[in-house]
Amino acid sequence: GTLEADLAVTNGVITALLDPPNDPADARGAHAAYLVDVTGLVVAPGFIDIHSHADFTLHGSPAAETVLSQGVTTLVGGNCGWSPFPHTGHGLLQRASSFMHPEVDWTAHDAGSFGRVLAADPPGVNVVLQVGHASLRLAVMGTTNRAPDATELAQLCALVEQAADEGVRGYTTGLTYAPCSYAALPEITAVAKVAAARGLTHATHMRDEGAGLLGAVDEALAIARRSGVRLQISHIKALGTA
């Protein structure tokens, strides 16, 4: 249920929950540095949007008014295998991600430099970064449709370690989208093992959400079991006719 009360906040921390006064001009309000009348509204913690692609637009719209107006105060980006890093600076990721209409400062090649660009014009929301497997593959292998060789797999893993060092909190796959769709179970498991060792989660847009849904769930679970990574299936649903 809900509770009707007055709420006191000091330095960003709730410090008192008080029965509402009969008189709106109660003396305790006079001692507040800032008084907000939210009579008839709901006070809630800021919402966390765990599935966002805002990392591709925050450089162009750092105030993030559209999400703040919905009560969202934390965005988790890098989902579905797509993150604005790492990239080689040759425009491949920029072109491949054009369907998201990115507003990205492409001078940032890795998670560290991307974060510094964000910090230079701080967004209006908290931002959690993840590194996407499609972006990793483009940086190492381009658009090639094959399994990585040993050197390339080592490079993929090294880039995940670098991203973890630079502050990302997750590793993601989008197995319906090329070039991430070219990655098979052994490749993803190897990279996910590195992610797990660095404490990252694995969020996946599975390989199939229609007739092959159950097989796609099995694949996601197999990756988690074999690698030890914590799994989050981004939008589990069934498409098609019942």
Residues covered by each model-derived region:
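Short low-complexity, flexible loop/linker segments enriched in glycine and/or proline
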Residues: 36, 89-93, 98, 187-188, ...
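Hydrophobic faces of well-ordered beta-strands that scaffold small-molecule active sites
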Residues: 46-52, 75-77, 127-131, 171-173, ...
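Acidic, glycine-rich active-site loops and adjacent beta-strand->loop/helix elements
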Residues: 53-56, 80-83, 208-210, 237-239
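Divalent-metal coordination cores built from histidine and acidic residues
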Residues: 60-169
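Di-metal (Zn2+ and/or Mg2+/Mn2+) metal-binding site signature of metallo-dependent hydrolases
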Residues: 42-66
